[in-house]
Amino acid sequence: MNMKKKEKHAIRKKSIGVASVLVGTLIGFGLLSSKEADASENSVTQSDSASNESKSNDSSSVSAAPKTDDTNVSDTKTSSNTNNGETSVAQNPAQQETTQSSSTNATTEETPVTGEATTTTTNQANTPATTQSSNTNAEELVNQTSNETTSNDTNTVSSVNSPQNSTNAENVSTTQDTSTEATPSNNESAPQSTDASNKDVVNQAVNTSAPRMRAFSLAAVAADAPVAGTDITNQLTNVTVGIDSGTTVYPHQAGYVKLNYGFSVPNSAVKGDTFKITVPKELNLNGVTSTAKVPPIMAGDQVLANGVIDSDGNVIYTFTDYVNTKDDVKATLTMPAYIDPENVKKTGNVTLATGIGSTTANKTVLVDYEKYGKFYNLSIKGTIDQIDKTNNTYRQTIYVNPSGDNVIAPVLTGNLKPNTDSNALIDQQNTSIKVYKVDNAADLSESYFVNPENFEDVTNSVNITFPNPNQYKVEFNTPDDQITTPYIVVVNGHIDPNSKGDLALRSTLYGYNSNIIWRSMSWDNEVAFNNGSGSGDGIDKPVVPEQPDEPGEIEPIPEDSDSDPGSDSGSDSNSDSGSDSGSDSTSDSGSDSASDSDSASDSDSASDSDSASDSDSASDSDSDNDSDSDSDSDSDSDSDSDSDSDSDSDSDSDSDSDSDSDSDSDSDSDSDSDSDSDSDSDSDSDSDSDSDSDSDSDSDSDSDSDSDSDSDSDSDSDSDSDSDSDSDSDSDSDSDSDSDSDSDSDSDSDSDSDSDSDSDSDSDSDSASDSDSDSDSDSDSDSDSDSDSDSDSDSDSDSDSDSDSDSESDSDSDSDSDSDSDSDSDSDSDSASDSDSGSDSDSSSDSDSESDSNSDSESVSNNNVVPPNSPKNGTNASNKNEAKDSKEPLPDTGSEDEANTSLIWGLLASIGSLLLFRRKKENKDKK
């Protein structure tokens, strides 16, 4: 009834008075009134005056219960067919400026997803209402009777609306009946931990007072108000309305909802006609921007309708002359909307309702403002609640001590957020600060909406300074120098218009607790601008900074820095270790080490080792050894030797030998040796040897050796060795070794070793080693070892040795040798020898030797070595020293591989020395 009165009033005001004067007949009045009543509904002015009524008197809606999940819900799309053609319209992308990401429409259809509150009306009269729902969210469809329109002109108009973080949608004509489909949205804010005690019910969360006062300026909006036209809201057909959001909205985490609309425009619409979108008072369309605008609806590059926001926060769109020339115009619209902090002041459930005419959509969401940050007795939280990009200003509201704890000597500082390119200007000229005291913490709104009239202004009682660039400092000068109630600090600042950075601020509260411990607590706020629009309140989070080292210390302004951390480490370790190991290894290692080691080791070990090792070793060795050796050895050797030797030897030897040798040897040797040796030796040997050897050796050796050795050795060795060794060794060795070693070794060794060794070893090793070692070792070792070893070794060695040997030998040899030797020797020897030998030899030899020797050796040796005073027929106890110096072509020390020929070569060496000495003596006599 009221609508009819309004319609008559509108007709009488605009049309009927003029018609009665001109026509003056009742027939004309009757004909005109029936048509004008349908086309001339409320004007914009009337719509504005009745907006509150339409908000409360819209057709019934179904409120969706809150969900337990956060599934996003998208706007709906409605499709219908027309007789001859259709025109679809979507809103323009870049016209709406807000502080949060908004959505865009896409030209795709997708299957429905859960949780959208959507209402759709069809262009078919008397179509029954249906409800589409998922989980606990409900959708409502309300029938709306409309007139079908026909057209012979087919126009398709499309444009893309680009508020961010959304999915574009376009209405598609399909069938006569209207189908509603949902598109998924990616717009849900990521939730953070919330305090369940802060969740209030709807009547606590929503301020029901009216009228609403918006945070944005409507002056510019009013200036853009269109010329009054006809309100055709109820003549729109195929109307769809949707509220797209998760079940929880976090306003202080840039959370927002999307309002989605779709409709068809009647062909009778003309330029100046309007329609209204009702927006719930719990939402606003500006976020934190000071002025709100709504996007125009675009048809390609042409404006279909322009929108403004009225004083109640609703949206009025006015059609342009585009509709005068087009039929079957369809449009879709998406607007981001934000929780209004003035009307929703606390955390709790809120029911949102929006619509076009009698078509509405409802959805209940949980608004979660989250709690302040707290660290011991310090609590703080801030938010950026207003930005004016026109004047380059911002407003930040900070709650200091919202928990109401006791804070002694409190100090608040504000500065740019570290490690960001913040565009804020903080100084005395660009920053204004107000401080308010709150007597009761319950008076603080969780939405950070502040009415200054409700609190005491104490700005003049505090000390505000700007101690550093881009930093302010607020000292709360209370009589007892402590605070026990909350304070509100409102900062009005400026933004650098020339900066490309975002607005990022840090607020830090310092203070003592009751135990007089100085601590600090910080809160960060950010706002990012994207595509010319503000992106909301930003991601707010508490920060616990590094605590001050000194009481009263204020955090300095951080500066950008690049750091290249470096570390120095030193380690001092003493280790005592014992191990049983069997290894098959292939290693390629490069090492440069300098070590200074002083170790004293007393070891008593019984070892039974069965090891299979395959070794391929490439080693480059440069060795400087200083060795002092005193060796007393008893040896009993039984040798049976079968030797086949093919030797090509080029030797340049300068030997000065003084040998005193006392040897008692019983040797039984059975040796099968196949040796291929090519030896190039440049040897300067000065040897001083005092050897007393008693050796009992039983050796069965099968050795296949291919040796290429490159060794540069400077060895100074002082060794005192007392060795009693009983060795039973069965060794099969296959070794391929390429050794390059650079070693400088100074060794002073005093070794007393009693070793009973039974070794069975199978060793296959492939090793490539590049070692540069500088080793200074002082070792005192007392070792009692019982070792059972079975060794199978395959050795391929490439050795280049440069040896300088100084040897002084005093040898007393008593030898009984019975030798049966079968020797096949092919020797090519080029020898240049300068030898000065003084020998006192007492030799009694009984040797029984059967030797079959096949030797093929290639050795390049350049040795500069002072060898230890080792016995000629050493036992297994000296294997450790021999292994270290095995690459040096030194005299045979009685190892397992050479024990079988020691007696023969000792006898030959004695005879050769006597002959050489006699020849020199004869040469001297001739001279």
Curated annotation (Swiss-Prot):
Changing N525A: 2-fold reduction in clumping titer compared to wild-type. This is Clumping factor A. One of its GO terms (biological process) is aggregation of unicellular organisms. A motif (YSIRK-G/S signaling motif) lies at residues 9-20. Residues 47-65, 106-132, 143-162, 566-598, 856-867 have a biased composition (Low complexity). InterPro entries: Adhesin_Fg-bd_dom_2, Adhesion_dom_sf, Fibrogen-bd_dom1, LPXTG_anchor, SDr-like, SDR_Ig, YSIRK_signal_dom. Keywords: Cell wall, Peptidoglycan-anchor, Secreted, Signal, Virulence. Residues 881-890 have a biased composition (Basic and acidic residues). A motif (LPXTG sorting signal) lies at residues 890-894. Its main location: secreted. Belongs to the serine-aspartate repeat-containing protein (SDr) family. The modification Pentaglycyl murein peptidoglycan amidated threonine is found at T893. Residues 547-565, 599-855 have a biased composition (Acidic residues). It holds the Pfam family SdrG_C_C. Residues 71-105, 163-200 have a biased composition (Polar residues). Residues 34-200, 529-898 are annotated as: Disordered. GO terms for molecular function: fibrinogen binding; fibronectin binding. It is a peptidoglycan-anchor. Cell surface-associated protein implicated in virulence. Promotes bacterial attachment exclusively to the gamma-chain of human fibrinogen. Induces formation of bacterial clumps, which diminish the ability of group IIA phospholipase A2 to cause bacterial phospholipid hydrolysis and killing. Significantly decreases macrophage phagocytosis possibly thanks to the clumps, clumped bacteria being too large to be phagocytosed. Dominant factor responsible for human platelet aggregation, which may be an important mechanism for initiating infective endocarditis. Residues 894-927 form a propeptide. Residues 1-39 form the signal peptide. One of its GO terms (cellular component) is extracellular region.
